């Protein structure tokens, strides 16, 4: 059970980081385009 829990936590962490990084990357790209 412990291994399954770790895998679930790892997947949730990856999904969370992806959801958080998505908007940040879009924001940084828009800022760079604005500066150029």
UniProtKB/Swiss-Prot annotation:
Annotated membrane topology: Single-pass membrane protein
Residue stretches spanning the membrane: 8-28
Record note on quaternary structure: PSII is composed of 1 copy each of membrane proteins PsbA, PsbB, PsbC, PsbD, PsbE, PsbF, PsbH, PsbI, PsbJ, PsbK, PsbL, PsbM, PsbT, PsbX, PsbY, PsbZ, Psb30/Ycf12, peripheral proteins of the oxygen-evolving complex and a large number of cofactors. It forms dimeric complexes.
Repressor recorded as keyword: no
Gene Ontology biological-process entries: photosynthesis
Family from the record: Belongs to the Psb30/Ycf12 family.
Pfam families hit by this protein: PSII_Ycf12
Role: A core subunit of photosystem II (PSII), probably helps stabilize the reaction center.
Paired cysteines (S-S): none
Lineage: Eukaryota, Glaucocystophyceae, Cyanophoraceae, Cyanophora
Subcellular location, principal: plastid
Keywords: Cyanelle, Membrane, Photosynthesis, Photosystem II, Plastid, Thylakoid, Transmembrane, Transmembrane helix
NCBIfam families: PRK13686.1 (NF010239)
Protein's cellular compartments: Plastid, Cyanelle thylakoid membrane
The protein, known as: Photosystem II reaction center protein Psb30
A GO-annotated cellular component: photosystem II
């Amino acid at each position: 059970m412990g291994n399954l829990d770790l895998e679930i936590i790892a997947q949730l962490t990856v999904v969370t980081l992806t959801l958080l990084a998505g908007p940040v990357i879009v924001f940084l790209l828009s800022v760079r385009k604005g500066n150029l």
